[in-house]
C-alpha cells in the first residue's frame, strides 16, 4: 500500500511516502541556496511522493528565532523557492511548504528585526517564565494576515499546499497550551478560546487560496 498512488485533493502522489519537515539552517538572508535546492531535488529523485519543507518563517517582524531559516519576503527568496519547487515537480514529486512563527523562542537582538521582541499569547514562554511580549489584538490580526498572505504566495510559486506549524511550543502552540496562555479575552480560557487563534489562521489561509490547495495543520503535545 505504501507504494500505491494516492490523490490528495487534486494533487497526484506517486506513492504514500511523505518526507517530514526538517530545519536546515542553510538559507542566509532567508534565501534558499543551491545546496538547499539540490537537497530537495535529491529526495524527489529518490521517489519521495510528498515533501513537506523545512519551516518557512512567515513574513512577520517577530517570526524568526534561528539563523539562516528561509522566508518568503524578498524577490530573491521567492525566486529561489520557485526553482526549488520546480526541481521537485520535474522529478514527479509533490511539495508542501511549512509556515512557521517561532513565537517566544525568539531571543533579544535576533535578526532580521533585532528591536522586535518574541511574541507569545500572554508573555510566557513556559509556565512561570515571563520573558516575552504578550500579543495585543492588533498583533494577533497582523500575524493572521501574514500567514494568509504567505500561503497565497506559496500557491503562486507552485507549491501543492502548505502546512501550518502549530506544535512544539512555537507561537500557535503557545496559545493552545493553558500553561502558557493566561489571557482573559476571547483568545484565552477554555480550549475553544485557546484554539481561536489557530482557527482564525486556518480560515484566513483558506480564504486566500484555491479550494484544491492543500492546507494542513501540525499539532503535538511535545514541547521544544
Residue ranges and their predicted role:
Residues 52-77, 99-112, 163-189:
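Glycine-rich, proline-tolerant flexible connector loops at the mouths of alpha/beta enzymes
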Residues 68-96, 178-215:
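Alpha-helix-loop-beta-strand connector modules within alpha/beta enzyme cores
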Residues 84-88, 139-164, 198-208:
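An active-site-proximal structural segment forming one wall of the substrate-binding cleft
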Residues 1-102, 143, 151:
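N-terminal capping/small domains of soluble enzymes
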Amino acid at each position: 500500500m505504501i507504494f500505491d498512488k494516492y490523490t490528495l485533493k487534486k494533487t497526484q502522489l506517486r506513492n504514500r511516502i511523505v518526507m517530514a519537515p526538517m530545519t536546515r539552517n542553510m538559507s542566509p538572508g532567508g534565501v534558499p541556496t543551491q545546496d538547499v535546492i539540490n537537497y530537495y531535488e535529491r529526495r524527489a529523485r529518490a521517489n519521495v511522493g510528498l515533501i513537506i519543507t523545512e519551516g518557512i518563517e512567515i513574513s512577520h517582524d517577530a517570526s524568526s528565532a534561528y539563523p539562516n531559516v528561509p522566508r518568503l519576503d524578498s524577490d530573491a527568496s521567492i525566486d529561489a523557492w520557485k526553482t526549488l519547487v520546480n526541481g521537485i515537480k520535474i522529478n514527479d514529486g509533490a511539495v508542501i511548504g511549512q509556515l512557521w512563527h517561532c513565537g517566544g523562542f525568539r531571543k533579544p537582538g535576533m535578526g532580521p528585526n533585532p528591536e522586535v521582541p518574541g511574541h507569545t499569547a500572554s508573555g510566557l514562554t513556559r509556565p512561570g517564565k515571563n520573558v516575552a511580549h504578550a500579543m495585543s489584538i492588533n498583533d494577533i490580526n497582523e500575524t493572521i494576515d501574514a500567514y494568509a498572505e504567505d500561503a497565497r504566495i506559496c500557491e503562486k510559486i507552485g507549491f501543492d499546499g502548505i502546512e501550518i506549524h502549530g506544535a512544539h511550543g512555537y507561537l500557535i502552540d503557545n496559545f493552545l497550551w493553558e500553561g502558557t496562555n493566561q489571557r482573559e479575552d476571547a483568545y484565552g480560557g477554555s480550549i475553544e478560546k485557546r484554539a481561536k487563534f489557530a482557527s482564525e489562521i486556518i480560515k484566513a489561509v483558506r480564504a486566500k487560496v484555491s479550494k484544491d490547495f492543500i492546507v494542513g495543520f501540525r499539532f503535538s503535545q511535545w514541547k521544544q
